[in-house]
Design a protein with these regions (language model features):
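Active-site-proximal mixed secondary-structure blocks
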Residues: 1-119
Length: 119
């Protein structure tokens, strides 16, 4: 279940979390979405608000979903999901239903943005 977390209470190292453990960027709706693995980006503060910065190449299928929706999610997983994260980073959602292949359970978050129950 999705829980709202005050970013100021986070104790994990963002360099390890993003750079070593990776994350999934997901956008669309719970019924029709796409996801991609990322191992780059950043977190910080912009205009006194917590923020995350994501960089997505224009040719990525996920970028179409991010551009066409108001919300997207960033999901982090433990090491047992490394194989799934590899799949999501090495195949295109145009060709493969990555979410089905990984066995992820899609949930609706803020703004109906899709996220994964397993994260």
């Amino acid at each position: 279940m999705l829980q709202k977390i005050d970013p100021k209470t986070l104790t994990m190292n963002p360099f390890t979390l993003i750079g070593d453990q990776w994350l999934l960027i997901t956008a669309g709706t719970p019924e029709h979405c796409n996801t991609m693995t990322a191992s780059w980006g950043g977190v910080g503060v912009m205009w006194a608000e917590p923020s995350a910065t994501c960089y997505i190449r224009p040719q990525r299928y996920t970028k179409e979903f991010v551009d066409n929706n108001d919300y997207f999610t960033l999901c982090f997983f433990d090491e047992s999901y490394r194989k799934a994260l590899n799949l999501c980073g090495s195949t295109s959602g145009r060709d493969v239903d990555k979410i089905k292949e990984c066995g992820f359970t899609v949930q609706a978050g803020a703004g109906n943005a899709p996220y994964f129950a397993e994260a």
